[in-house]
């Protein structure tokens, strides 16, 4: 992994005339930003700081779904050796110069490797043996050993493009420094002053123009002097094209060993053979107004300009998950040049306008205020974000939580768009060649959590990459089912890469609790059906969702076996990443019929049965699913009063495990609810309390899950307590979620997304078919307003509350029909109207039913 190199400024001259200042255009962009702020009254939508980022994890992210960049707002003050570890510089901290700029770049298809069959072809011969070890011999340790023999190859790793640097030189000292990320315009801006000249840098990632844009301006003519250069650990060459273009080319590794995984593999394997690792190209065009621009020794040199605009595009040799990435370097570079040519035809003001308009059509759908609007200089929003975070424990800051909520939506918009790859463990942002957990799609909760907020937070289009991903996975998963287990349908495990690896990974040394867990297919299929529930898109259900769900159900139906007690069970079965204490008092991993397996299969079968009925198909198959569903091991309450994690009431070897897989039917599932299954809800609460009492939820994503659990249990104050813990202990200064890893913390984006979804759950729930309003409102949020949340049934919901009580709600369905609403605890729905009162009837569960007309907005009042 290479550090980011920089060389000294080399004087050169090549005159390029420039006559027009861009202050007018800059003003147009600012006007767009101001109009955006006006559309979010009472909202605080900026992360801002008074010093540059001194390490990668403190930089500010921009992205268009495909391209991503971390914007430092500064650059290293001294040269760094490109051959040394990138982590030493990028993970820092290192001294930074605010007059410089650093963008660490990513493109969502740059991965190591190529399509391979990672299945262990000897695996299926061990399936009977592992089942006998568990069910007949009760030898769980032997079962663990056999599971190792069923493991295949590790997945590949997400790779960094490199870094782009702009080193400005000034004769005086920098004062008045500020860098910010404005969620209203998806733009990172850095401002400072040198003597009487004000400097500004603005960066954004445009989806419509498929480019990253960096604009640098001075308030007085001729005051910009800069060197533009690029570097990276995988970079093969950096060269200039003409006097104003910089071309960076490189090649991803043939193979990357999983960071932190056991084994003796060479960590990084490079190859010069075409198709063994993909080529990539990043090309930057520089336009100046005023001054001179010259190319010299792989750098671009700017002298005496007033503005400087950089356009950057990136392409890779990726073709498809099932095709070798054998595109030549020349072809990849030409594709990048064509993309840049298209973007370069637009003026800067057009680039800004198109970017902001595109972004706002997603972001503007939801607004959230968790307190009265305050505009005086003493409000928390007037403090830098790192200070607000530091002060959170002593001075709880509801507006910071509203900002955090919107930041999660921003990150999803920036990392997942139709046509892109899904958001991975770090979204689309990564600086390491060998990143933690390969920066892949870990599917025993992480990729699923990434998409928890997509539907409820009104970003349904952002789920499209996940839906397409599942379709791809069904192909490799069918091969995994056949070659690993000798079974029909499709299966996937916990570790998936660009090539859609579906096999159990580990190469014989992986822990069975993650390597041999085989239930990610049913979990991912839950997202297919949830997308249908939120959108009511019947054509999607018929042509895309149901066929994939059916394939997963076919595997599960064949995977189930008799347990000897009249039930159907799964074996081998793992409760994700948690061991249990075997009868001999030693930890073991592999058993039969873990609670999560039963929950996922029961949910999948139910969704398939409902879909088949809705579509009028597969009556016989649905009947088979129904018969099998009735024989699944039921949920059980253990000796501590807890929801059992395993079919046998084992004790956990790690009572504070961050994974809480047996709680799936509470959230994100919907089988356990306080009203519908009160005894099981009580047991789930005991399980949650035991986990937290033993130090559980120590990672950001696990804490986010706890917030969602408390929300589903209707305990707003406990949800707030966990949310507060997340802000204090699992949130970085740039509001990235963190995962503790020894002496340092690792960025993992799932906690951001999980917490955003959990906040939405505190304000509105719809998983039972009833739209529950303010189901888990904490005392800490006595007043507030939310607009634009989405409920299942394709209903948009807004709410306003004061003194802890709902004042009004706005309901807008996409379809005509009957809907059920429930008032907050202690209140009742007084009226529902759309110009005239809508008849309503109270049901036995306390909710009210009413018929609503599509595309009309209804006002709900409360008593």
Question: Which functions belong to the PLM regions below?
Answer:
Residues 813-823:
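Short, surface-exposed polybasic-and-hydrophobic patches located at secondary-structure transitions
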Residues 2-3, 7-29:
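N-terminal export signals
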Residues 311, 358, 469, 527, ...:
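Generic recognition of well-ordered alpha-helical segments
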Residues 34-512, 530-532, 542, 550-553, ...:
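Aromatic-residue-lined binding/catalytic grooves and analogous aromatic/hydrophobic interfacial grooves
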Residues 537-538:
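Short loop-to-helix capping motifs
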Residues 520-531, 544-557, 702, 719, ...:
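Extended, hydrophobic alpha-helical segments in both membrane/secreted and soluble proteins
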Residues 57-81, 86, 91-104, 109-110, ...:
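C-terminal capping/lid segments that line or modulate ligand- or cofactor-binding pockets
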């Amino acid at each position: 992994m290479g550090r980011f190199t920089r060389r000294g400024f080399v004087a050169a001259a090549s005159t390029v005339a420039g006559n027009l200042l861009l202050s007018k255009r800059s003003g147009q962009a600012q006007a767009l930003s101001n109009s955006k702020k006006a559309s979010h009254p009472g909202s605080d939508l900026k992360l801002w700081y008074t010093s540059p980022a001194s390490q990668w994890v403190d930089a500010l992210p921009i992205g268009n779904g495909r391209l991503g960049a971390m914007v430092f707002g500064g650059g290293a003050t001294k040269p760094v050796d490109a051959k040394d570890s990138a982590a030493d510089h990028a993970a820092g901290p290192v001294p930074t110069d605010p007059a410089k700029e650093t963008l660490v770049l990513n493109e969502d298809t740059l991965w190591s490797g190529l399509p391979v069959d990672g299945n262990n072809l000897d695996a299926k011969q061990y399936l009977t043996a592992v089942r006998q070890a568990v069910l007949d011999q009760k030898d769980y340790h032997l079962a663990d050993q056999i599971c190792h023999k069923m493991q295949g190859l590790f997945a590949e790793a997400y790779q960094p493009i490199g870094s782009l640097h702009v080193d400005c030189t000034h004769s005086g000292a920098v004062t008045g420094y500020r860098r910010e990320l404005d969620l209203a315009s998806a733009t990172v801006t850095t401002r400072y002053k040198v003597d009487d000249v004000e400097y500004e840098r603005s960066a954004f990632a445009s989806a419509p123009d498929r480019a990253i844009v960096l604009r640098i301006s001075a308030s007085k003519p001729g005051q910009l002097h800069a060197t533009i250069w690029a570097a990276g650990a995988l970079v093969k060459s950096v060269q200039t094209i003409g006097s104003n273009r910089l071309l960076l080319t490189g090649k991803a590794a043939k193979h990357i060993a999983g960071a932190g995984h056991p084994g003796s593999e060479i960590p990084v394997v490079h190859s010069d053979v075409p198709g063994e690792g993909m080529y990539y190209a990043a090309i930057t065009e520089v336009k100046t107004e005023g001054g001179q621009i010259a190319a010299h020794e792989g750098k671009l040199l700017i002298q005496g300009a007033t503005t400087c605009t950089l356009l950057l595009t990136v392409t890779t040799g990726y073709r498809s998950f099932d095709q070798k990435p054998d595109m030549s370097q020349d072809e990849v570079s030409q594709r990048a040049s064509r993309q840049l040519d298209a973007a370069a035809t637009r003026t800067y003001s057009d680039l800004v306008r198109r970017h902001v308009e595109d972004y706002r059509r997603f972001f503007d759908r939801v607004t959230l205020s968790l307190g009265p609007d305050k505009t005086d200089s003493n409000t928390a929003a007037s403090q830098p974000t790192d200070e607000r975070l530091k002060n959170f424990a002593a001075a709880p800051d509801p507006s910071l939580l509203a900002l955090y909520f919107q930041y999660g939506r921003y990150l999803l918009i920036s990392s997942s768009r139709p046509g892109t790859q899904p958001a991975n463990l770090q979204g689309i942002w990564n600086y390491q060649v060998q990143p933690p957990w390969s920066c892949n799609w870990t599917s025993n909760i992480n990729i699923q959590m990434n998409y928890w907020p997509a539907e409820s937070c009104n970003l349904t289009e952002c789920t499209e990459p996940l839906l397409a991903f599942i379709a791809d996975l069904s192909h490799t998963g069918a091969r995994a089912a056949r070659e690993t287990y000798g079974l029909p349908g499709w299966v996937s495990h916990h570790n998936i890469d660009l090539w859609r690896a579906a096999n159990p990974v580990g190469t014989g040394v992986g822990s069975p609790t993650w390597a041999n867990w085989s239930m990610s297919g049913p979990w991912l299929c839950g997202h297919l059906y949830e997308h249908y529930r939120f959108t009511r898109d019947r054509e999607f259900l018929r042509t895309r969702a149901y066929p994939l769900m059916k394939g997963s159900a076919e595997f599960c139906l064949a995977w189930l076996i008799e347990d000897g007690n009249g039930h159907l069970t799964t074996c081998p079965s793992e409760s994700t990443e948690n061991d249990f204490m075997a009868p001999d008092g030693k930890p073991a991993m592999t058993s039969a019929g873990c609670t999560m397996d039963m929950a996922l299969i029961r949910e999948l079968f139910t969704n398939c049965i409902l879909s088949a009925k809705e579509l009028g198909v597969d009556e016989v198959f649905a009947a088979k699913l129904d018969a099998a569903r009735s024989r699944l091991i039921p949920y059980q309450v253990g000796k501590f009063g807890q929801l059992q994690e395993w079919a046998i009431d084992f004790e956990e070897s790690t009572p504070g495990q961050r994974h809480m897989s047996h709680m799936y039917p509470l959230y994100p599932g919907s089988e356990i609810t306080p009203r519908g299954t009160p005894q099981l809800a009580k047991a789930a609460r005991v399980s949650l309390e035991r986990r937290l009492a033993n130090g559980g939820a120590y990672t950001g994503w696990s804490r986010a899950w706890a917030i969602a659990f408390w929300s589903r249990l209707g305990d707003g104050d406990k949800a707030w307590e966990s949310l507060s813990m997340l802000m204090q202990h699992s949130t970085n200064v740039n509001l990235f979620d963190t995962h503790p890893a020894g002496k340092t913390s690792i960025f993992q984006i799932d906690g951001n997304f999980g917490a955003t979804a959990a906040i939405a759950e505190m304000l509105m729930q719809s998983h039972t078919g009833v739209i529950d309003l303010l189901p888990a409102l904490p005392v800490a949020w006595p007043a507030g307003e939310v607009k634009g949340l989405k409920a299942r049934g394709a209903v948009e919901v807004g709410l306003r509350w004061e003194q802890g009580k709902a004042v009004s709600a706005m309901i807008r369905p996409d379809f005509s029909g009957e809907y059920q609403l429930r008032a907050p605890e202690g209140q009742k729905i007084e009226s529902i109207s759309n110009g005239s009162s809508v008849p309503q009837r109270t049901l036995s569960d306390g909710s009210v039913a009413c018929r609503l007309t599509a595309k009309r907005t209804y006002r709900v009042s409360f008593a």
